[in-house]
């Protein structure tokens, strides 16, 4: 926790169009250089997929998401108990301010829903970009196991049920000796988690 909690959680902002151009170039060069090597089974395009940031690119994406969901700022104001004049005034970094959550939890809830959908879209972009250069090898994405490992889902928010439909292989991240959670008394927890890709 701390003042950095909503800063970009990765080394590059996956919502920035220039970064996406770089990903396209990188995938093209790496895949063309390696795809015929016999040791290549497939491509893991996003390990421990998560994305947490309140930067301007993501904020604009969020404002557009709200516009598509609510249609008018008047409808959003009615649902959220707010008085915005335009979607451009909605700032996600204010969503958990005390005045905000006392009047309505929707700003915080909606932003987490947006973040989950945005991450799935990012994963779809990475999958499609890699598949464009290699349609033979399987493409893998894996989640963070956040829903069974952390108490605050906002740290690594994702919708693994939806994201699991994107790649050819959906994997999981779990370190049994980490975080003091080995689930020896509740083995069904991991069973449920690993059944996510099956739907």
Segments from the language model and where they lie:
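Polysaccharide-binding and catalytic clefts of secreted carbohydrate-active enzymes
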Residues: 2-161, 165-169, 173-183, 187
């Amino acid at each position: 926790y701390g003042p950095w909690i909503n800063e970009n959680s990765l080394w590059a902002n996956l919502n920035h169009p220039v970064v996406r151009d770089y990903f396209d170039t990188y995938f093209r060069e790496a895949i063309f250089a390696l795809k015929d090597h016999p040791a290549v089974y497939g491509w893991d395009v996003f390990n421990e997929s998560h994305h947490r940031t309140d930067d301007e690119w993501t904020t604009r994406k969020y404002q557009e998401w709200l516009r598509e969901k609510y249609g008018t700022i008047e409808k959003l104001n009615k649902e959220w108990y707010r008085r915005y004049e335009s979607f451009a005034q909605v700032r996600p970094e204010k969503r958990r301010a005390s005045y905000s959550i006392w009047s309505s939890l929707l700003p915080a809830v909606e932003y987490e829903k947006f973040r989950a959908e945005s991450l799935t879209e990012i994963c779809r972009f990475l999958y499609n970009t890699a598949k464009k250069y290699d349609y033979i090898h399987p493409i893998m994405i894996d989640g963070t196991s956040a829903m069974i490992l952390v108490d605050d889902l906002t740290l690594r928010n994702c919708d693994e049920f939806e994201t699991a439909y994107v790649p050819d292989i959906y994997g999981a991240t779990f370190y049994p000796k980490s975080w003091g959670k080995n689930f020896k008394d509740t083995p069904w927890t991991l069973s449920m988690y690993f059944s996510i890709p099956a739907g």
